[in-house]
Amino acid sequence: MSVEHQWHRWPARGPTDARIAAVTGPYATVIIVVALVLAVWAFVLVAANRPPNLSILAGAAVLEALLVGFLVGGVVQMLTSHHSFAKAEFVGYLVACVLIPPAGFVWGWGEKTRSGTAVLAVAFLIMPVMVVRVQQVWAGPGA
């Protein structure tokens, strides 16, 4: 069966199926790259002794939109999948992914010094770790 043909199979049958792209495919990679770029950007602002500004808010909004899509895609995949994995843990990590950047921004925005920007940088650095952890939980036990 060709890869293109596998891509159109529905529902997803397990962790090796090509339909799991929202959790393990290019979409997750985009989230990781965007989060790392934002972290570097935030650390540049920290080094320049700058507080959080609207430009970093715009970047955080893009990341948040990607993470909401990750949450929705992950839940849809979970509901249409037949393989065994820790579903509550999976949803917990997905929800945490969506909540961490806004929490970091509220905290960082309230601190109008470079420390506030550092809080944002840490929140952005947490995202790649969380995405990889979602992928590990999706893969199931023994993966």
Question: Where on the chain are the PLM-derived regions?
Answer:
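Hydrophobic transmembrane alpha-helical segments in integral membrane proteins
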Residues: T16-A39, A139-P141
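Loop-to-helix transition at the N-terminal end of transmembrane alpha-helices
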Residues: P51-L67, A88-V91
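Non-cytosolic membrane-interface motifs at loop->transmembrane helix junctions
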Residues: H82-Y93, V119, G142-A143
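Membrane-helix boundary connector in multi-pass membrane proteins
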Residues: P102-A118
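Structural signature of hydrophobic alpha-helical transmembrane segments
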Residues: P26-A35, F85-C97
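N-terminal amphipathic/basic-hydrophobic helices that include classical n-h-c signal peptides
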Residues: M1-A22
